[in-house]
């Protein structure tokens, strides 16, 4: 319950901060607020883009949540998504003549492998040298981004004249026009199935149980004989592979190409998403629609209402600042104070005679028993 309260307060305050920024930075606040809150649902194209972004947010949040469940924090999401998208664009820009499904599967496997290897380096350094995975993953991501930028601009630039993107993906590999059950975009459907598989892995498999135990209590994991070092490595590999899946779906689903800097901010958005959900897989999918709505609404406000500030950044900042606050602490202090006042009143008014003393002891024992029971429940 405390986690739910903290998450709800962080989200509400983040939305309030974004609304305040829109009012302060816009020349016409009413038009900007209307564009922010209503325009994402105004047309079918906006709704379709919202569903596509929700699928990407599910994959991103799964990557961040898998790292959190194993006791790690993967800050290299931007670089891992970027590398996977770049590899996908290179492998799918032309048809090889071996079957579309086979080529699509090879590109997917390569994208997952590249991102998983980048994350695996941080896991190995954590397991063998006890280095911080946050620092190593962030540094590797920071090193990969300018390297891929240079490759896109020089070697793999679109020969048709686009200076900031690779050649577009072959039309047969694009998921943008593909739909699945009830008209839901294919990206969101595939991402939901992946979320279901990851949730079953952590909840109903022996290896997933070991991952969760070693992530929460590594000393206990070592005591019972679990390979904690393997948890670090494979947890980061799984996190990187899911970030790579995000890059793959970004190229074949939403963008159709790999352009310079398309993954900027995705890693931190995924971390904010996972922190709000407290790494609960079942919460990630519905929460993805909220984050997709926020990003779509911010773009609509910037384009339609001439807003010069990307307010999604303020949402992420508010979440990072507020998610760690213990908002239930004041309520617990009030409960403790009320309990002390109750004990004082019982002591004052039940002091005369053996009958009153017995009644006082009984009242205090019943109150303490109820408090202990409610505390454990």
Curated annotation (Swiss-Prot):
Q: Name one Pfam family in it.
A: BPD_transp_2
Where found in the cell? Cell inner membrane
What is this entry's stated membrane topology? Multi-pass membrane protein
Any single GO molecular-function term of the entry would be: transmembrane transporter activity
Please give an example of a GO cellular component term from this record. Answer: plasma membrane
Where is this protein chiefly located? membrane
Keywords of the record:
Cell inner membrane, Cell membrane, Membrane, Transmembrane, Transmembrane helix, Transport
Q: Membrane spanning segments where?
A: 4-24, 49-69, 72-92, 98-118, 135-155, 182-202, 223-245, 249-268, 274-294, 303-323
Q: InterPro entries attached here?
A: ABC_transp_permease (IPR001851)
Name the family: Belongs to the binding-protein-dependent transport system permease family.
- Protein purpose: Probably part of the ABC transporter complex RfuABCD involved in riboflavin import. Probably responsible for the translocation of the substrate across the membrane.
Subunit record text = The complex is probably composed of two ATP-binding proteins (RfuB), two transmembrane proteins (RfuC and RfuD) and a solute-binding protein (RfuA).
- Protein name per its UniProtKB record: Probable riboflavin import permease protein RfuC
Question: What broad taxonomic lineage does this protein's source fall under?
Answer: Bacteria, Pseudomonadati, Spirochaetota, Spirochaetia, Spirochaetales
- Which gene produces this protein? rfuC
């Amino acid at each position: 319950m405390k986690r739910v309260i903290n998450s709800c307060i962080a989200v509400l305050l983040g939305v309030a901060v974004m609304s305040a920024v829109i009012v302060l930075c816009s020349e016409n606040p009413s038009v900007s607020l209307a564009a922010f809150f209503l325009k994402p649902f105004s047309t079918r194209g906006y709704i379709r883009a919202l569903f596509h972004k929700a699928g990407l947010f599910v994959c991103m949040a799964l990557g961040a949540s898998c790292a959190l469940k194993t006791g790690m924090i993967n800050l290299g999401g931007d670089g891992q998504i970027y590398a996977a998208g770049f590899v996908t664009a290179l492998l799918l820009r032309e048809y090889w003549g071996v079957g579309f499904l086979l080529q699509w599967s090879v590109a997917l496997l390569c994208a997952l492998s590249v991102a998983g290897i980048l994350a695996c380096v941080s896991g190995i350094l954590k397991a063998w040298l006890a280095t911080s995975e946050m620092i190593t993953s962030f540094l590797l991501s920071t090193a990969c981004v300018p390297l891929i930028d240079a490759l896109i601009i020089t070697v793999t630039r679109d020969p048709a004249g686009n200076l900031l993107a690779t050649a577009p993906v072959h039309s047969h590999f694009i998921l943008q026009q593909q739909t699945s059950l009830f008209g839901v975009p294919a990206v969101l459907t595939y991402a939901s199935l992946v979320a279901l598989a990851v949730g079953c892995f952590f909840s109903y498999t022996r290896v997933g149980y070991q991952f969760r135990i070693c992530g929460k209590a590594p000393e206990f994991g070592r005591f019972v004989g679990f390979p904690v070092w393997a948890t670090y490595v494979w947890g980061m590999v799984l996190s990187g592979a899911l970030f790579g899946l995000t890059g793959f779906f970004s190229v074949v689903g939403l963008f159709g190409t790999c352009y310079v800097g398309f993954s900027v901010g995705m890693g931190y958005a995924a971390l904010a998403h996972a922190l709000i959900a407290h790494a609960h897989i079942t919460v990630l999918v519905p929460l993805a629609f909220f984050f997709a709505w926020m990003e779509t609404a911010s773009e609509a406000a910037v384009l339609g209402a001439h807003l010069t500030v990307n307010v999604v950044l303020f949402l992420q900042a508010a979440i990072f600042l507020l998610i760690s606050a213990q908002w239930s602490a004041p309520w617990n202090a009030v409960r403790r104070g009320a309990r002390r006042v109750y004990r004082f009143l019982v002591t004052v008014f039940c002091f005369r005679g053996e009958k009153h003393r017995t009644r006082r002891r009984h009242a205090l024992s019943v109150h303490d028993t109820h408090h202990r029971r409610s505390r454990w429940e």
